[in-house]
Amino acid sequence: MLIEKMHNLTNSKISKFILGLIAVSFLVGGMSGYLFSSNDTYAAKVNGEVISQQDFLNRYNQEFEIRAQREGEAFVAQSDSPEFVTALRQNIVNLMIDQELLRQYVKELKLGVSDEMIKRAIVTDPNFQVKGKFDNAVYQRILQQNHLTSDGYASILRASLPLEQIQNGVANSEFIVPAQVKNSAEVFFQKRLARLATLSLADEMAKQSVSDDEIKTYYEANQKSFVQPEQVKVQYIDLSADNISRNLQVTDVEIAQYYQDNKAQFMTQHLAHIQFANEQDAKVAYEELQKGANFADVAKAKSLDKISGENGGDLGWVNENELPKAFEDAAAALQVGQYSQPINVDGNYHIVLVQERKAQSLENVKAQIADLVRKSLMESRYFSLEKQASDKAFEDSKSLNTAAQAAGVKVQESDYFSRQNVPAGLNFPNVIYTIFESDTTNVGMNSEPINVGDYHTIIVRVLDRKAEGVKSLEEAKIDIETFLKRQKAENALNGKAQQAVKKLSENPESKVDGINFSSEQTFTLSENKDPILTNGIFSIAKPESSKALYQVVHNSNGDVVVVALNKVEQGSLSEKELSQFAMQLLRSHQSELQVQLIQGLRERAKIEVNDSFINQDDEAQQ
C-alpha cells in the first residue's frame, strides 16, 4: 500500500527498491510534478514532457525537510556541504525522471483506477485500521500529519495505484522453478569440513629485517606513494544540548504551572463532521440541522468524506494539532453537543460537531510535561550561551579562551590531521569545509559558529597548517620498513605453504615442519564470519574420494592458511526452510527485474537534464 510506504518514510524506513522510492515520491511531492507550467524553465525533459524547475525545487525542499526531520543531526551536519547538496539534487531529479517514465508507461498501457478501487485501498490499508477494522480517526490523523485532505489523498492514489499495478505485475512475472531453488540452496547451505594450519603473518614479520639501503631504494622508486596531504592542527569549542541538559532540573511547581497554562494541549475531543465541496451545499445542510435533522443522517447522505460519512461523520477521539487549525479552532469554540456553522478549511466546507470532551490528568501527562519544560529550558540556555560564545569569539578573534568561558566549556585541541583522518568530534562536512577552505581560518582567526545538528554548535580555530608535500625519507621510514617486512613475510609464508601443499598432496601422512592442523571445522556460506577465508575454502574443488585436498588460502588478518578439505556435504533444508529460502531468492530476482524495468524505459527514452540548473547551489536559485 502507498500509505504504508509514506508511513515508513516518516519513520525513517526508506524503500530498498527504486520503484518503491518512486511510489513514495508521489506522497512526498503530491501531484505538483505533473502540473507543468509553460512559463518555467525546465529542470529535465522526458520524451518531450517537461519537469519544471519549480516542481523540482518543491520536491527538493520537501525531501530536504523530511530527511532533516528523520535523520536529525546527521543530516543537518551534511547539508552545508556542496558535494552533498549536489548529490541530493541529482538523486531528486533522477527520481522525478523515473517517476515520469513510469507515468508515461502507465498511459501507454492504458491502466486506470476506479473510485471503488480507491475506496477499497483506503479501508483495507492496515495503517488505517485498529484491531483489523478501518478507523476513520486514524485515517484523518495520518492525512493531517502529512498535510493531505481526503480528496487530495484520493487523487494521489489515483495516480499511484497504477504504478503499484506495474510493480506487482513485474514482480509476479518472475518465478523460480523448484530445481533452481534446490540447486541454489544446496550451494548456499553446503557444508565444507576442513582442517586449517594457520601461518601467522605478524609472527613472520617479527622475524624479518630490513636494511637502510632497502628502505632508501624503495623510497626513491616510489616517491608518489609518499605524497602527504595538507594537514592542520586546530583548537575548538563544542556546545551541545547534551552538556547543557545534564545540569537542568525541572520542579513539580514548573510542571503544574505548565499544565495549567496549556490545558488545551492535553484535551482530547470526540468529533464528527460533514464535508462539502462548496459553501452553498454546506448552508443548505446547516439549515436542515437547524430544523432538527439528525447530524449522523445528514453526514451519511451528504458528506463529501464518504469514509467518515458512512459512520455518521464520526472522526473518533482527536488530540490537539491532529487536524487543520481552522477545524480545531471551530471545535474549540463549541460546547459539547453543539455543531458549528459551515467553516472553510483548505477550500472545502465543514460543519463540526463536538460529541465529547475530556482532559487528561496531570499525573498521566507529568512525564511528558517534564520533557517539554526541560526542552524549553535547554533551548533558552543553549541559544543564550551560543550568542555569548559567538560574541566573545568575534571580540577576541585569535583565541577561544574567552568564548569557552562564556559557554562554560573547555577548549579542545587536536593533533595534526588531514581531510582523510578528521577526528570524530570535528568530522562534519561543514566543519571540514571551514577548516580547509575558509579564508577566516586560513589566517588563524576564530570561525563563526558552525551548526552541526539540532542544538549543536562548534567554533574552530586553526593553530597550524602543513602544506601538501612528499614525506621525507625519515618521515616515511617506519611505513616503508613495515611494508617491506610484510612483503618478505608474505613471500616466505606463501613459499612454505606451497611446499607443504605439494608434500601433503603426495603423501598425506607426511610431517611438515611448522604445519600444525587444527581439529576439523565446518564452513558454510550462510554463516560467513571471515569472507576471505570462507571464499577461499569454497574455491577448492570437491574431493572425489575420501582423500583430502590441500590448498593455500588467506584469512582476513593476512595470515597464510593451508587448508585440508576433507569432505563436502550438500546443504539440506526442511520444506519450511526451503520455502523461506525460495521467497528470499524470489524477492532478490524481483528486485533485479524492477531495476531492469527502469533501465529499459530509460534506454528507449529521450531524456534531457538541465545540468547547469541541477548543479547550481540553493542560494543561486533564491
From Swiss-Prot:
<dbReference type="InterPro" id="IPR023058">
    <property type="entry name" value="PPIase_PpiC_CS"/>
</dbReference>
<dbReference type="InterPro" id="IPR046357">
    <property type="entry name" value="PPIase_dom_sf"/>
</dbReference>
<dbReference type="GO" id="GO:0061077">
    <property type="term" value="P:chaperone-mediated protein folding"/>
</dbReference>
<keyword id="KW-1003">Cell membrane</keyword>
<comment type="subunit">
    <text>Interacts with the SecYEG translocon. Binds to the lateral gate of SecY. Forms a complex with YfgM.</text>
</comment>
<dbReference type="Pfam" id="PF13624">
    <property type="entry name" value="SurA_N_3"/>
</dbReference>
<dbReference type="GO" id="GO:0005886">
    <property type="term" value="C:plasma membrane"/>
</dbReference>
<dbReference type="Pfam" id="PF13145">
    <property type="entry name" value="Rotamase_2"/>
</dbReference>
<feature type="domain" description="PpiC">
    <location>
        <begin position="270"/>
        <end position="356"/>
    </location>
</feature>
<comment type="similarity">
    <text>Belongs to the PpiD chaperone family.</text>
</comment>
<dbReference type="InterPro" id="IPR027304">
    <property type="entry name" value="Trigger_fact/SurA_dom_sf"/>
</dbReference>
<feature type="topological domain" description="Cytoplasmic">
    <location>
        <begin position="1"/>
        <end position="16"/>
    </location>
</feature>
<keyword id="KW-0997">Cell inner membrane</keyword>
<dbReference type="GO" id="GO:0003755">
    <property type="term" value="F:peptidyl-prolyl cis-trans isomerase activity"/>
</dbReference>
<dbReference type="InterPro" id="IPR000297">
    <property type="entry name" value="PPIase_PpiC"/>
</dbReference>
<keyword id="KW-0143">Chaperone</keyword>
<feature type="transmembrane region" description="Helical">
    <location>
        <begin position="17"/>
        <end position="37"/>
    </location>
</feature>
<feature type="topological domain" description="Periplasmic">
    <location>
        <begin position="38"/>
        <end position="622"/>
    </location>
</feature>
<dbReference type="InterPro" id="IPR052029">
    <property type="entry name" value="PpiD_chaperone"/>
</dbReference>
<keyword id="KW-0472">Membrane</keyword>
<comment type="function">
    <text>Chaperone that functions as a gatekeeper on the periplasmic side of the SecYEG translocon. Facilitates the translocation of precursor proteins across SecYEG by interacting with the translocating substrate. Also plays a role in the release of newly synthesized secreted proteins at the periplasmic exit site of the Sec translocon.</text>
</comment>
<keyword id="KW-0812">Transmembrane</keyword>
<protein>
    <recommendedName>
        <fullName>Periplasmic chaperone PpiD</fullName>
    </recommendedName>
</protein>
<keyword id="KW-1133">Transmembrane helix</keyword>
